């Protein structure tokens, strides 16, 4: 790993990464709004911010001093999180310190393997690569392919694992044990409470990513509304 990669990974250790995303058509769907949200969560103690889309990545990068984890979503089915080398290059060029991409074993649209994608990206950019995985096997595959960080982002969304009501602790714990310090595991996906985040960390996660429960007021409002019915 490069010195840059080591520094970024060390800066995230034991911390909270906050995902600042709004979906098309939503009131908060604007790069400057997401940049303001990112500044707010940094003030609250986030060690990194995850942002979606080139405009958002660039805007967030200009507003925070913590690392920016960038993704580019194309659609919402199959491989859609930074699905090709072209997408990864663009996310890097937009200013991301960490490029998160699909780290599953599925075939990629540009015909490149995950290992080829990571190798080419790292040859061109001094960037950290996070693999968004859907299972333990995905995580081991992504580590072998050269990913610097292994995330549980896609657990429950690829058909390989059931969608748990909350974080997939089983995958988090298994990856930590199987990787045995070779790659940091980032717990992400359906972490909605501080207790859930704490449990993920206690299982050995390097850092925890929380999005909806912090930065998506429409969903949070719905949770309260439903509880009052």
From Swiss-Prot:
Presence of keyword Lipid biosynthesis: no
MF-aspect GO terms: N-acylglucosamine-6-phosphate 2-epimerase activity
Entry annotated with the keyword Isomerase: yes
Main EC class the enzyme belongs to: isomerase
GO cellular component, one term: cytosol
Keywords: Carbohydrate metabolism, Isomerase
HAMAP family: ManNAc6P_epimer (MF_01235)
Similarity-based family: Belongs to the NanE family.
Function comment: Converts N-acetylmannosamine-6-phosphate (ManNAc-6-P) to N-acetylglucosamine-6-phosphate (GlcNAc-6-P).
Record protein name field: Putative N-acetylmannosamine-6-phosphate 2-epimerase
Organism: Cutibacterium acnes (strain DSM 16379 / KPA171202) (Propionibacterium acnes)
Lineage, highest ranks first: Bacteria, Bacillati, Actinomycetota, Actinomycetes, Propionibacteriales
Chain's gene name: nanE
């Amino acid at each position: 790993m490069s010195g840059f990669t080591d520094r970024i990974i060390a800066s995230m250790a034991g911390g909270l990464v906050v995902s600042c995303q709004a979906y098309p058509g939503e009131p908060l769907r604007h790069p400057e709004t997401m940049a303001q949200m990112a500044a707010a969560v940094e003030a609250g103690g986030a060690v990194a911010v995850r942002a979606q889309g080139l405009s958002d990545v660039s805007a967030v990068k200009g507003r925070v001093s913590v690392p920016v984890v960038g993704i580019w979503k194309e659609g919402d089915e199959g491989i859609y999180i930074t699905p090709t080398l072209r997408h990864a290059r663009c996310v890097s060029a937009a200013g991301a310190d960490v490029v998160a991409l699909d780290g599953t074993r599925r075939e990629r649209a540009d015909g490149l393997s995950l290992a080829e994608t990571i190798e080419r990206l790292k040859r061109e950019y001094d960037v950290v690569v996070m693999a968004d995985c859907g299972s333990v096997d995905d995580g081991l595959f992504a580590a072998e392919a050269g990913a610097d960080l292994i995330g549980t982002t896609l657990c429950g969304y690829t058909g390989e694992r059931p969608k748990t009501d909350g974080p997939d602790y089983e995958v988090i714990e298994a990856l930590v044990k199987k990787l045995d310090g070779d790659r940091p595991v980032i717990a992400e996906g359906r972490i909605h409470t501080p207790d859930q985040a704490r449990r993920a960390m206690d299982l050995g996660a390097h850092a925890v990513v929380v999005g909806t429960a912090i930065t998506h007021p429409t969903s949070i409002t719905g949770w309260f509304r439903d509880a009052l019915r």
